[in-house]
Amino acid sequence: DEELAHHLNADAKKYIADNNIQLYTINAIDKAIEIGMGKRTNTILQSAFFKLADVMPIDKAVEYMKAAAKKSYSKKGDAVVEMNYKAIDAGVDAVHKVEVPESWKNPEADAPKAERTGRPEVVKLVNELLDPIAKMDGDSLPVSAFADKADGQYVTGASAYEKRGTAVTVPQWDPEKCIQCNNCAFVCSHATIRPFLLTDDEVKAAPDNMKVADMKPKAGAYKYTMSVSPLDCMGCGECITVCPTAAISMQPQESQAAEQPVFDYLVANVSKKTDAGMVDTTPKGSQFNQPLLEFSGSCAGCAETSYARLITQLFGEQMYISNATGCSSIWGNPAATSPYTVNINSKKGPAWSNSLFEDNAEHGLGMEVGQRYLRDQAIELVKEIAASDKATAEFKAAADKFLETKDDTKANVEPTTALIAELEKAAAAGCEKSKEVLAKKDYLGKKSVWIFGGDGWAYDIGFGGLDHVLASGENVNVMVFDTEMYSNTGGQASKASNIGEVCQFAAAGKETSKKSLSEIAMSYGYVYVAPVSYTHLRAHETE
């Protein structure tokens, strides 16, 4: 009860006391672990509900629940059935009533919250919209709160402020055992475990409890650390699964609280080291790139976000994403809480949009054609300015470099920045065409257009549009999250499901074979297809 009082805020205490609410708690997590059910608390909580709700006699509820458990799990063996029986009994027995003290009617004021820092537009969004929504008080928001978002546009990066702390256990890194392969970061679905290289000055300025190691296999100018955000971690344990040297162990979240300031310091203050010999396009090297998809609402261990996060590490600052409805649109952009974000230095990141389910491929194609049209207009103006007598030697040099690299997404980044600087000088000197180009400057750099969606979209509902886009020969990238069933709607069979596959809502098993989307795409002869899985050779993904 004392711990509960510490965690409840003053408003909650007063509301409970003033309304004479009967308050109960149950330590379902410890009970589940004790029984052998791991983190599965649903059965325990269900029986606790029946104990308190009084919708039927509790002995009848227990009888029905145990009958359902036997029917559901008997094929998995008596031991599993018995564990569920114990969970049902535990839910009834472990409910604890909290005696609400009189002092809660006039509770002490909460300690003042630390002022949020970061991009002003994101902090404003979190304070004005995300906070009320997170408190289940979104209905109190006036229409005027959404006036500047009438077109549906939201700034990205708000997920970093949620800090939900939902994991029971989180990773702890052992620098002595670590071989610095970065496999743990490579598979992390929520970007909550990240490697960093630090200078001596960055190490000195860090929190005292930060652990570091010399770089391997050969010590260099930088120190290496692997940091975890315990308040963002979902506790899936994928990092442990892929670690070849047992350098990661799962520890109670409370024991790792001191790691949060370390992670926050590293994210905000440690720069990427471009001279450390790390190749961006290798599994190890890619993980030193800032992930521009972080702390999403996807399920613990979700592989979809692992792949999407990796793509943002390779192309994120130049990405346009057209996203089909499905799991990837739910974790990709829940209202006001975009997990996509911007590079901490350039302030650029993926631009994300969701159209109708069946129109996603066409929507993505429209993104490519539309931005290319605007870019071509700007490029023609740049050529005209460079050809004029008034163009400076510096402008001509910047324009030449930009035009040389205009078809290479990576190589075009720095020349675009240099050209914009020269355009600003020319505009200040009165060049009207430079002002026209600057009005379209966001389109100057070569973009990487991506179309995201699941197999329900790609194989079934949106296949006609996808086939049209693949056949068009346009320069777009398509990422299909092939879960071999309709995941977001609960588990129906799709054309991606294998013969005999049993899904939640296809219990009889699929009678036909899996559709070969890759062979259909390859039949055109000019579409590059790459099935990837990080459970196999990880280098294939970055390639």
Labelled PLM ranges:
Residues 1-131, 203-208, 335, 501:
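Active-site cofactor/cluster-binding pocket
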Residues 73-74, 359-429:
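N-terminal leader/propeptide and maturation segments of large enzyme subunits in energy/redox metabolism
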Residues 158-159, 172, 183-203, 229, ...:
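Iron-sulfur cluster-binding cysteine motifs and their immediate structural context
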Residues 535-543:
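Conserved small/polar residues in nucleotide/adenosyl-binding loops
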